[in-house]
Amino acid sequence: MIKTIQKELEGLDIRFDEPLKKYTYTKVGGPADYLAFPRNRLELSRIVKFANSQNIPWMVLGNASNIIVRDGGIRGFVIMFDKLSTVTVNGYVIEAEAGANLIETTRIARYHSLTGFEFACGIPGSVGGAVFMNAGAYGGEIAHILLSAQVLTPQGELKTIEARNMQFGYRHSVIQESGDIVISAKFALKPGDHLMITQEMDRLTYLRELKQPLEYPSCGSVFKRPPGHFAGQLISEAHLKGQRIGGVEVSQKHAGFMVNIAEGSAQDYENLIEHVINTVESTSGVHLEPEVRIIGESLL
């Protein structure tokens, strides 16, 4: 199959049996059979249509910030959008390709004195992943500012989804069920005062640095906020701060995070997540639901 791929997708950036831990925020993850970096939408469409024609599974990994890739890796094509990252500003509308860094996109908004994106100034990951998850923080979320998203269907066709049809909810969008892949997104912002925007972004950045364990690899916030509770508080009350399995630990700085402190594995993450869920449920009666996505094959 490698020779067929090299022939049919000649000139494209495709890497074979590539370890994904080189690209994930957690620094864990086994190999992808075929890791592709399309430079434009035409290349992306070629990859998807080729994979479909050969019955090869494919998926988009995004910036891999809120994902745990299992140690056995991922079969088929894994597509990363690092090279699809253009951001343009037209009046009060920002259009960003899916691979654009979300934090950098908020800085572009600030440069143009556009307000509405400040909440995301510390959220790691890509624009595509943010739309997929309806990313949010400090009272704001993508649903509040999205105009529309251009997506690639599982059949390799392009279409546009208006914000009103995204079925946004807490860390949810319709894309999670449809199988569509975000290619780009348009955001409607408002004119604002550059100094006030800067001060708000500085304030939120300070809070993030104060509360979150940014010094270690992690997948960000591990659990969704349970109704009427805070996941981190429940985990702390269960005396799980500092709990460690293998090389992965419940952060002592913020119990809602798990950090890779000693070359941990994806299995360490999974085991610790399961332990935290079970312990919190037994101590508080609250069942925690993971916010992080766990994908790929286990080595076990």
Swiss-Prot record:
Cell location: Cytoplasm
One biological process term in Gene Ontology: cell wall organization
What reaction(s) does this enzyme catalyze? UDP-N-acetyl-alpha-D-muramate + NADP(+) = UDP-N-acetyl-3-O-(1-carboxyvinyl)-alpha-D-glucosamine + NADPH + H(+)
Q: Please give the cofactor(s) recorded in the UniProt entry for this protein.
A: FAD
**E.C. number(s) listed in UniProt:** 1.3.1.98
Question: PROSITE patterns of this UniProt entry?
Answer: FAD_PCMH
This chain belongs to the protein called UDP-N-acetylenolpyruvoylglucosamine reductase
Name of the gene: murB
